[in-house]
Amino acid sequence: GTENILGAIGFGKAAEVVIQNSGENTKVKNLRDLFETKLSQHFPRVNILSQNVSRLGNTSAIVMPGVLAETQVMGFDLDGICLSAGAACSSGKVKRSHVVEAMNIGDEPATNTIRVSFGWDSTEPEIDFLIDTWLKIYERANKKI
């Protein structure tokens, strides 16, 4: 068949960009780690999934005890923060995370996990705002009426 020359050129350019920006990946991982450290300091009960294993440098999966993922996503959205629940391959669907279910760590993580992704332009003040919002959502959801 015909060789995909344009595809090969595009792939080569993409590889160049990845190499040129490899330092950005370290920066993003450091921001993710800073977020997880600060969140753990403010809320020791937080469950950060797969925190101590090799994983994507830009993503955190966090269980908010007692608060459904859908409730969290709506709360963050109201404050202008975009994040998601469930696996990346099922974005936009409101259902239990099949990825977290496969980890076999219980029902609450499968229903209460949010996924936070950081990018090259993410900043420490944005992380602080995210943590403040996280705590506000948790407190509001657990407020005794």
Predicted feature locations:
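Pyridoxal 5′-phosphate
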Residues: 1-145
